[in-house]
Amino acid sequence: MTSLFDALSRSNDRLPSPNFLPEDFLELLKSNDFDTKLTTLIRAATIAKREEDWFHKFQKKGELFKCIDKIICDDRWELQHQCIKFLVEAMPTFGSATEYCMCFVMPNLIPKLVSNKVTVRKITHQAIATFLRLKPEALQSFLKMLSNFMPNCNSKSELITELHHILIPELVKSNWTCLVENFTTESNIQGCEDQAGVLMKKLHYFIGNEFWQKIITNLSPEKREVLEQITANVQVEHTESKAGSGVLRASAKPQSGGERRLRFGIVPSLVCALIAEDTDANQRISGLEKMKQVVDQITPEEIARLVPHLHSYLLMLSNVLEDLNFKVVVLALDIVRATGHHLKGHMEAHIQQFVNLVAKHFGNQKSVIKQIIMMTFMELFQNINPKTVGGCLRVFLENKNSRVREEVINIYTASLMTISPSKFNLQPLVNILVPMFHDVKKRVRLAAFEQLSVLAYLLNGKTEIIMKPVRDFEQDQNSRGLTEAVTARIRRQVLPRIRYDGLIEYSTPPMMDSFDLAEAEMSLPSNADLSWIVSNGGVEPDPFERTMSPISLAGNLATIRRNRVIQQQGQAEKPSFSLPQQPAQQASHQAQRLPNGIEKSHETSENSSLDIGQRIVMTRMKSDDSFVRRQGSAASNPNSSTSSWEAPKRPPISPSEKSSISATKKEVNNNHIVKKGNLKSMRARSDTNLSEDHGEEEMENDPPRSFDDRPAKASGQYSFQDFDAAIVPSSMGKKSISHHSLPITSHPPLKHAISQPQKRINNNGTFLRSGQGQRTKSVSKPHRELTAVSKTYSLLDTSNMSVNQALKKMSSDEWADKVDGLNMISTLSETQPRMVADNLKEVIIAILNECKNLRSSVSRVAIVTIGTVAQNLNSKIDSEMEKICAVLLSKSGDVSNAFIRDDATDSLNKLVKAATAGKALQGIILAGAKSKNNTIRSSCANFVYDIITIQGSSAILNNQNALSNVLPVLLQFSRDQSPQVRNPGKQSLCFLSKDPNFDRLMRKNALESEIKAVKDVLANVEKRGGVDSLESTANLSGSLSRIGSTRRVQKKLPDSLQLDLDEIRTELLAAGWERRLTGLQRFEEMCGHASKAVASDTRLIEAFISRLGDTNGKVASCAMETYISTMGSMAKLYSTESNLKAVMNQLAHALTAHLSSKSEEHKHLARTCIQHTIRSIEPVSLLPAMTSATKKSNVKQRPFILTQYCELSKLAYKSKPKQVEVMALPLLWDSVKNSAPDVDNKKATQYLAKTLAKLIGEKQLLDLATSELDPNRKKQLDALIR
């Protein structure tokens, strides 16, 4: 754990970390930055409340309290308040060290009782009272420190007033002699005798007359006389409150009714007291209503008084917003809105706190709250820079709650529709929006596409700004169809609208409610956006991201089982013949039928409405893996549940019968609500009424009566009623959550022969539960003979099998049925290939869906099946090559399971040999050539080489289209960073070059640039030993398999830290040079205490590098000074972090540009930066960037940069001599060929030549120069060396 904030990202179901507070926690507290300290204390208070044993695990307790003691003395009251609040929250966790720790900070804590800030005073006496409540025996220590402070106190009356709060019930029987002696000393109470008398009188009533007389008898006569004088004229009322506790009221000097104290400069203290009353909602509502009147009538003078107290004012509202009372929340949000409306630009300094305040109720489904939040942000966008507000909102797009993400997107959309687009930077908005298209929730994707329409309209035809990030994201995620979906939405030319209440009304009806398009229409290109919103590009959501609902939440378990039995009896009565399939258009008009084929009447349908209603309620309870599979297989399985449920299949009916049906049957949508009109007449529904129409909970669509209607069984419940008589294994109670506990414990390579998932049997013949392994106790169940378990289709009569039957089994929830279906497809492809070929599209889609199955035993069988089908169908598989290659290549790069990689590679080998060479080559290239996974690219390069060798060189070279597709890919492979990708690419080019007509055909069918690039690659191969050297290198590099199955996961930064980084980047890119200077200062501070976080943000580094070349001289100088000061903490990261290596070129070019500056200061700073860079960063990492900068340098820049490049080459040659030769020698040839006439450039070229001659050797250097330089230039080089 690298920072304090990482602890807050831990989910509730994880075990607490043994080192809960990180090592850099103390460094954060010692930081000079105000925001860093404040944020650290806020997070620490949260941790202290949540984890009881954090203090015992923390090692440096003494140093921690030294930091706290120092922060309490800080001049800024916000830090004082938060630090003392941390003590209040953490004090119960100190245990036996409470007295020692609190007495350590008490001398600096007591003076805060007389602070000029009411907030600090309140939290201080709360901390002291908490301490004394936990440790009553520590009262004497506290009173002695109080006595030491009294003589030096300048506000004794305020101090005495605050001491009333320590009269708590736990201290009734304690010894108060020290306090009485202190207050009977004349020097201590001079000028505040009345307040001291009131306190003494209250103490008298508090401890009782018996203890009071004991204290008085021990006083000296002088002090006894002083005590009688100060208490002589004081009267204290002793009344009983409702709770039964004693309440003392002093009547010495009552305040006049006209006097009142104002909190925050504008709010009467009486109103604040009503608001603070959290036990009585009516009083709090009354106080909020009065406060609302004050805020609505605020004057400019009152605004000036409120602004200095704005932090504590918003803190008070934040506490109120945590109330559970609806009216309280609405009034508080309305006050927040009014505050932002009246303060306008004054709110910018507290914008992050303001946004976090309102964000407490993001995702709330109450219409009033959503309206107030929308109004608040619309006014905020108008009064403050929209870019600042948008940056604060961005962090909530990563919230786990999908309703929060949807609401934030709608706020962005509304702001774009109401604010001038010139105030926004649309490109970053597009970059933020694009990942939302791939969100796991339909509602979020729908909201994102609505915002897309608005952005496309504002860009006024410049769609490339949108399409480029979409294509990049699609490539990064290896998802297909997003570009088409975005294009379809842009072509619709429809926009959402803002309703009368300020909320967004979508331009298209949400697919979760009703969708009047048939499935055939969904596949049209014009509806690609709707299809994407429904299916998310066919990507199955992770079932472990959803919380498993316990069976008890589903309702009456007895009712569920009774409905299940009725359903099984109904299914048993059905005839066992298969009905022909019909198109979706006809199926939507078919009538319901009873099991015996008789048509249901309208009355019968109405009588079953109660059962339908029960099923609607039960759909929320379905198991998560069936829900996931239902979404993923929507387009593939005609008999499975989809987002648009089809009617049951039946034979064609006559037109007269259709008319009679339509006259009696009401058309209902997916939620069984009677439709009132078609899609054109339907009012689009907003994000608000989307949930209001459904009641408090959102329901899933009700599928047909099929396998999805089976209620989820409780974990550990097993039944044999769901299976055929020949099948013995029990059903799974719960899906296995890890591939380590699968039934296949040994992982033999799967062959194309039929495979059945093995069942492990214990000694007594009972079965172990699937997914539990040997750790599960055996359960005695009735079972049949073992011979019935091993069912192989090779021994069955294949005439009884059909593709539809196999697809139905594959759509089952049970993994064993899925494997049976896959094995049936494999057998049918061997025995009846014509049947499989006629239904090839449906078969391939179903198998590919199972390739993505989370259970590896199913996915492996599916991967092997796809290879078997391809092997048996040969060229008939060509039409599905692209889909198959995309899935299998992604599986060949799977880092979690080496056996899946091997199976995918075997199936691809069969696919490549079976399909047409041209189609196979095209599919392989499209699926893997541009992947970012090294293993996938390596697999792709090897298969391309295999296909080229199968097809032959002449077939490629003579076909201009084929050559134009293959040649750029092979050049890309030959330049790849991974040797496993480079070597097959070079081998392919070498194979083509062996053709006798290679040169002629290349000149005829290839471009000149490609011919030159190919020659360079072939020359490099020959220089390194030819094709044989490539094969030996490939053998040394290893195969595609990886050692281990783990992947390094990039940890997500905490939201608060990421927000700081975003703010710094915004300031670095600001239009005003003063803000850019501020951004540089904050960047330097952030590098000092969170360098790894800075290094992880590539955009922040790029923004900093852009300041190195700033047009403003002050900013550029400050940036270079900042670069030098941060080099100590960032140097190692520049050498190791891949994202920083990617920006090294920009850094080198930015520094080199100042070498030709007219300003001597800039030139000196640039030289210093370059020298520090070469000394600090690892030479091999820096060498490519410096080579590029040296090549592009001009005449003025070249002498210095070339000299420094020589020093870098000396350092890098020790570890990477070949790399230095490859990079430095072309630079030397270029310098000799194009040498400048001035003396400095000649000296620099001579220094480079001598350096390389010393490193490589003079003779070898001249030999290498023979093929690069003409004789005259070679003589010049010889003269330079000598």
Curated annotation (Swiss-Prot):
Keyword Repeat: yes
Region of interest: TOG 4: 1066-1282
Pfam families for this protein: CEP104-like_TOG, CLASP_N
HEAT repeats: 59-96, 100-137, 162-209, 261-300, 308-345, 349-386, 388-421, 424-461, 838-875, 879-917, 919-953, 961-998, 1095-1132, 1177-1214, 1219-1258
Chain spans, region TOG 2: 268-515
Any one GO molecular-function label of the UniProt entry: microtubule binding
Domain of life: Eukaryota
Subcellular location: Cell projection, Cilium; Perikaryon; Cell projection, Dendrite
GO term, biological process aspect, one: hyperosmotic response
Record region (TOG 1): 33-240
InterPro entries: ARM-like, ARM-type_fold, CLASP_N_dom, TOG
Primary location recorded for the protein, binned into one broad class: other
Biased composition (Low complexity): 575-592, 633-644
Tissues and organs where the protein is expressed, per its UniProt entry: Detected in a subset of amphid neurons that lack wing- or finger-like ciliary extensions. Likewise, detected in phasmid neurons.
Annotated segments matching region TOG 3: 800-1022
Free-text comment on this protein's domains from its UniProt entry: The TOG regions are composed of HEAT-type repeats that assemble into a solenoid structure. They mediate interaction with microtubules.
Protein name, entry field: Crescerin-like protein che-12
Gene name for this UniProt entry: che-12
